[in-house]
Amino acid sequence: MSRFFYGSGSDSDSSSDEEELLTDREEEEKSEEESSEEEEETSEEESSDDEGETGANRFLRDASESEESEDEEKVTVVKSAKDKRLEELEGIIKLIENAEKINDWAVISSEFDKLNRQVVKVTQSGPVPRIYVKAVADLEDFVNETITKQKSAKKMNASNSRGFNAVKQRIKKNNKEYATHIEKYRSDKDGYMEGKEEEAKPAIVAPRLTKVERVVEAPAAATSTDDGFATVGRGGKTLQYTPESILKHLRVIVESRGKKNTDRLEQIKTMEKLLEVAQTPYQRIRVYLTLLSTRFDISSTSSANYMSVDQWKLAEKELAALLSVLETNRDHVVTEGAEEWEDDEKQPQVKPGETLHIPGSIVSHVERLDDELTRSLQHIDPHTAEYIDRLSDEKQLYTNLVRVQAYIEGLVEAEKSDMRQDSLNRVVMRRLEHIYFKPSQVVTILEEGTWKALPSELDSKVTPRGNAGDVTGLVQTLCNYLFTYSDGIIRARAMLCQIYFLALHDQYYRSRDLMLMSHLTENISNFDVNTQILFNRTLVQIGLCAFRAGLIYEAQNTLSEVCGSGRQKELLAQGIILQRYSTVSPEQERLERQRQLPFHMHINLELLECIYLTSSMFLEVPLMAQTSSSPELKRRIISKTFRRMLDYNERQVFTGPAENTRDGVIMSAKFLAAGDWKKAAEMLNSIKIWDLMPQPDKIKEMLSQQIQEEGLRTYLFTYAPFYDSLSISTLSNMFELSEKKIAAIISRMISHEELAAALDQVNDAIVFRKGVELSRLQSQVVTLADKSMNLLEANEKTLEQRTQGMANAFQRDQGAGARGGRGPGRGGQARGGPRLPGGQQGRRPGGQQFSGGALGGAIKA
């Protein structure tokens, strides 16, 4: 009884051991109750049938008795679950043997997987079956024979070759677990197979009143917790976490990655227990690497798109602990491409002077930690305290980045290789991306806190500890290192980060020269989307820097590429514009959302639009005044966005006071165009968004000065035709500028041939040249002539379309036979038709004929 109870086990791999024992116990009780009930019912039915057999039923008695006798002859064989599983095991082994005969490795590979899954179920209730040991031993011999036959291996097709390689890789790992059984089998095959199977000792199960009602007596050597309770694994076996079993547990966890119904939280608890019993540095490093990967797997399979805060902080602490172990034990190196240790029974021994290479990637872990923090910031409301708390975790992440950089520097110094150099470049790039957009004061605090948190003996050769206070030198050092040792996208991104940093710190000319010398403007379309976003951010920052420096033309010219499109949010990755009839697929939209920048990296779009419109106003208003007074000049538009907003505002019947930043700039432009520069300056300075810029008083003073200068230019363009001469002192009093400044502005206008005048320095006056500028009447005449020419050209095009280019379209006096139209003699003698009186053959009915209008009359005359 106990054997069947213990061996019933779990028929599905996904059910837990606790539920197996519970359900088995319940099923036995239910089966006993049901059997007793069925016996009672059958006895009652038999008695009722015997009493009720009357009439026709008496004549059917012989037939029923014969059927009962036939049923008694049939013997029903009841097999236990263990026997059924052994039969399934034998069937799989038979298929493998048949496939070996025809050399079908695809079938062998698939059946070998089934065999291993089936043997797990069988071994839950007993020892390893001898037929399984025989099968895997013979299969290993068959693999070795196939390897020796090189020619036959070359003749395999693709599916056969894949199956053979899969079996060859798995058979050695699999047979290590059954090495003792296989040795016994190979030493005496017949004697081994004739021996009897050992019975498994049943576990003693005691009922409990909890959901899991069982207590398994653990061995005395096992470490018990919770008042005598111990962790029990599959088949009721007590799980023992010892230093010798660490690699086996890790192997099971690694092989279960990617499979369904895998409890990763339980795996994490297991690895935390393994950390407690780990003794050697190799064991701790292996556990930390697997533990970090498992924590990151939780976020990839969860419904949330980012890692939870608790899991992230635990992963960050474990990464710091892993780095501490690696810094202490320099003979253990975690590197990509290292060979994996296959023997789980024993651990590798490091001889003095040698280095043990462990497969893994420290850089990938710190990059994943960085990405998870970014995803978390993307999904948190930036206007809450939670965002600020989450942003404070960046300090720990930056500390780990610097620590990983110092560790990889040591590896590169010990052994230079392209792979290690690439890893170092990736870490340096990540570090640069965390500081390039921050002001110097913030970076200084971050650097000082980082070096205080790191061990005192730890230092970096690329960025020494002593240079932490020089932020400009730090950015320059990181960028120069990437310029020297990297290429492609990393070098381009480093260049853009340096340009952004220089522009942020008001070094316009250096940032502009670097942008021009890099030639990134010509090649940016060849880079990935994230680099293009960084390019747009850098371009905008250069424009803002030019505006702060008072370089209005350069600012407007730089910002027009991004702000003129009306898609600032998309181009700067600060939001998604959802269009009604967009053809964007859900996958593209998901990628677009992943590329969005966290809120603390955003550039203020309202401030950006205000600066762009203000710069456009300073250029457009004088240009509009110049073209209105000089219509012979070709009309050109500097900013279509500004013109469109200004035209819309002028079409309004009633305009109220300015309600937002955009309205404030447009109202200021209207005052400036009307010549009232004081109201324009007052309106522009009243915009509150200037307070968000550094040194707002200096910015407002610069804006007032620009309005005075552009107001002077607008006044001269508008009223120059009405003056013979104009005193400079009068202009100085009117615009509150120094006479020297006014003379400089007028000289510049004269040199650029914007103003037909001369500067009389003796009398301090401007002398305008007559005959060059057109009067109002002359301007109107020129405008009328242009419109007449346009009308004439339009009529000529219409004429050619109607007559299809025939020269004799309006020669009516030459008679009916000479009519043009759609062909010679239409409706006349050419087609044999009757000649109509009055030369009216070929005319279309209805009486509506094209006469050419005024142009037709002119041609007929």
UniProtKB/Swiss-Prot annotation:
GO BP: formation of cytoplasmic translation initiation complex
Biased composition (Gly residues): 817-861
Record-linked InterPro entries: EIF3C, EIF3C_N_dom, PCI_dom, WH-like_DNA-bd_sf, WH_DNA-bd_sf
Compositional bias (Acidic residues): 14-53
PROSITE patterns: PCI
Region (Disordered): 1-76, 812-861
SUPFAM superfamilies named in the record: Winged helix' DNA-binding domain
Domain of life: Eukaryota
GO-annotated cellular components: cytoplasmic stress granule; eukaryotic 43S preinitiation complex; eukaryotic 48S preinitiation complex; eukaryotic translation initiation factor 3 complex, eIF3e; eukaryotic translation initiation factor 3 complex, eIF3m; multi-eIF complex
Cell compartments where the protein resides: Cytoplasm
Signal peptide: none
Keyword list, A-Z: Cytoplasm, Initiation factor, Protein biosynthesis
Pfam families: eIF-3c_N, PCI
TM region positions: none
PCI domain segment(s): 599-773
Major place of residence: cytoplasm
GO molecular function per UniProt: RNA binding; translation initiation factor activity; translation initiation factor binding
Family: Belongs to the eIF-3 subunit C family.
Subunit structure: Component of the eukaryotic translation initiation factor 3 (eIF-3) complex.
Biological role stated in the UniProt entry: Component of the eukaryotic translation initiation factor 3 (eIF-3) complex, which is involved in protein synthesis of a specialized repertoire of mRNAs and, together with other initiation factors, stimulates binding of mRNA and methionyl-tRNAi to the 40S ribosome. The eIF-3 complex specifically targets and initiates translation of a subset of mRNAs involved in cell proliferation.
Protein name: Eukaryotic translation initiation factor 3 subunit C
Protein species of origin: Aspergillus oryzae (strain ATCC 42149 / RIB 40) (Yellow koji mold)
